[in-house]
């Protein structure tokens, strides 16, 4: 009876956590849209968003056209993109850590970041700044295909081969990018590349969030159904074999989906590090290791985290904007040091 009561309490606590995070996300979105170089009352922000969504323009008739443009056309798309990016990167990090059975893995292990950087760098140096997102996505896809090809060649894909392949491809594309910068980049190009590689949501708009929204939502729904396989992956290949599960096949499918999500997000936002590393760890403190519970918490917490990181990037310096990657690194780097030193990862 005591065990049944404990399970019931655990379920109740989990429901409370989910409700709290959902409420926190809604409050975060409204507050983030209100904050910026020009602060807007939360009540006005709510009226504008609610009026636009319900097509009741009379609700926000008292607001100026400039205020409406700031809220609806500039800030809301940006906040929604940061929500999608945070949720997507955190989800990919969670799945990656289960897939390779390594708690300090993140999506960029597939070479996505270095491939995207190469594609973006090439187009920036060539003066084709309008096509940077497309170039970054193509570069990310090429790098991922190389990693998966190397890791699965001449036998089944293993976690060790995947990590080694990712390391090699990352080094290769980083060398290509550095060569292009050294040979053909001017001062303006270098600044653009530097800002892009540290992440930015400055170019967010309604049209630019359509693809990330479709991809992130679709992949999220898929992985919400894959908790049994993800839990099995955490137990290791030998356990999976006894259960009759082909982990090599699932790894290929999961890695491909992770690469697609990460590639789309990187092409839209640049390189934003540590989200896929730290959010799954923090989420496990609330949801445990069962991915049926873990995945929803990861998605909500990742979205909230990146929205606030973007708020800091927008408001911390007056009349200027900082790369969002600075703030994710300031939180992520100390946390990474903590989990390596305190959790004894990598020790025999």
Describe these PLM feature segments.
Residues 1-348:
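Alpha-helical transmembrane segments in inner-membrane proteins
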